[in-house]
Amino acid sequence: MAFFSTQPPYMNPVIPFTGIIQGGLQNGLQITLQGTVHPFPNRIAVNFQTGFSGNDIAFHFNPRFEEGGYVVCNTKQNGKWGPEERKMQMPFQKGMPFELCFLVQRSEFKVMVNKNFFVQYSHRVPYHLVDTISVSGCLHLSFINFQNSTAAPVQPVFSTMQFSQPVQFPRMPKGRKQRTQGFQPALQAPVAQTIIHTVHSIPGQMLSTPGIPPMAYPTPAYTIPFFTSIPNGFYPSKSINISGVVLPDAKRFHINLRCGGDIAFHLNPRFNEKVVVRNTQINNSWGPEERSLPGRMPFNRGQSFSVWILCEGHCFKVAVDGQHICEYYHRLKNLPDINTLEVAGDIQLTHVQT
């Protein structure tokens, strides 16, 4: 099944966020949220509702991190909650990026988290009454994207990526109903990425090209080498995101977090050696390299990538395509002075968020 854009995405929405779903919910509509959970979260809520009052919520999706972590699903009608459906499993990790997808079908919502089927929730009220999405809680959002299998197709003119195009939801066998406790085991699903060109978008702004899906921008949004400031530098819980495509004949590229003339953190994938080098440069002198990784080389020639760097009090944490790959202990301790991002080498940049 092919999916196509139905409305421009909301970029970098400020939490709590409430926005209109153009045309309301429709059968086949998929809503994708990509973001990062705060390091010390309490709760997250995604509501599909009628209007902005919050009195009528068709689907309340509510991860709660207390008591070992679980997810509550519910419906509110005329200001009154119905019976809860709980899944005693937490699909989100503290301080880590996530991709959350909701697929609207005639009888239920299906929910995927990080490419895995998580739960389905049967409609208690007509879904076509829903015209608003609201998001709140302990998270940062990069975007909310809307796509549908019934919209007119637009031919992509740019490369696809690996992290956030509509996923293929598993089908329930006919005659079987989903249980409210335990639900179903997670199932792997293939995913491809939308390329979103944005440079420090206005929070909550919608892109102005509804006729072209996010992956269809033909012009590179960034020049290499790329430099930009990091407002207020780093501090615990501060994170940045860099997405791009590795060139087919790439030898290496690097991401530098700079502190004046020094490099506090140098992240340097080298394709001939199949390693990712980490280091610090102080007064033009490099320190000892760190090369070990728990798994294989996470970057590949000719393929897309998404790098997320989270600052904590003692280290930087790095995830590639949603998978944690390493920690790098701070060698330069004055985190607010680390205020410049540099990206260079054999890649094309598609998205930077600082």
From Swiss-Prot:
UniProt keyword Transport, yes or no: yes
Annotated GO CC locations: cytoplasm; cytosol; extracellular space; nucleus; plasma membrane
GO BP term, pick one: positive regulation of regulatory T cell differentiation
Keyword terms, alphabetized: Cytoplasm, Immunity, Ion transport, Lectin, Nucleus, Repeat, Secreted, Transport
Binding site for a beta-D-galactoside 2: 266, 270, 280, 286-292
Record localization: Cytoplasm; Nucleus; Secreted
Function: Binds galactosides. Has high affinity for the Forssman pentasaccharide. Ligand for HAVCR2/TIM3. Binding to HAVCR2 induces T-helper type 1 lymphocyte (Th1) death. Also stimulates bactericidal activity in infected macrophages by causing macrophage activation and IL1B secretion which restricts intracellular bacterial growth. Ligand for P4HB; the interaction retains P4HB at the cell surface of Th2 T helper cells, increasing disulfide reductase activity at the plasma membrane, altering the plasma membrane redox state and enhancing cell migration.
Miscellaneous comment as given in the Swiss-Prot or TrEMBL entry: The LGALS9-like proteins are encoded by a duplicated regions on chromosome 17; there are at least 3 genes coding for galectin-9-like proteins.
UniProt protein name: Galectin-9
Organism field: Rattus norvegicus
